């Protein structure tokens, strides 16, 4: 019995020593080491209940500090992204009808509808969440019933898959066809344009019951290049917002647990 008591007391002392070192690591800002030391108390000294209880409280403080520091970092990153966005957004036209649109779309100025009536081309757009898409617009006479496009330079090319969102209409007897492609499911068309942006002869071919070929104008190529840059900034900001939300949720959870522990201690 005396041996068991001695061993028990020894474990308590060792656990207390680990807890002391964990506190020191926490104060030094070495949160990973502090967590390892707290976990060691639970693993190696499961019956050192007082040390384990204090370890749980310390772990909550570690979690809280980590999330608060993470928020500070995320806030600084968001400020950097916002500054970049502020410098970029003047290059684009934001179209948004607040009556029925929650999210607006950014266009390159040369590609807005009113400047392109009667023109067949590939239009790029990026919504306010950083999601980029392409729209192939055909109105060169007659119907193609096109659902895909190909961009090419010489023997190299990229081709969209068949669009899941294509539609046709007429305007004063002229056939107008449009097909949408989300970037990421565009068959590498955007990346092909980026890789060949310095070429002057990027061919654009509309693929349907028959084909129609034209050459991408320099401003259409530039629209894709510029909007890719905007998409990266906006999507990066959306990712930061998600991480900020997660950090705030974790902070509220930890604070609630700490409050519960305080109330339990009073009882």
Where are these regions (language model features)?
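Generic helix N-cap/helix-start motif at coil->alpha-helix transitions
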Residues: 13-18
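Hydrophobic/aromatic side-chain positions at a characteristic register within alpha-helices
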Residues: 19, 26-27
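TPR/TPR-like alpha-solenoid signature
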Residues: 19-20, 57
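Alpha-helical linker/edge segments of TPR/alpha-solenoid repeat scaffolds
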Residues: 58-89, 97-100
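Internal interaction segment
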Residues: 173-181, 199-267
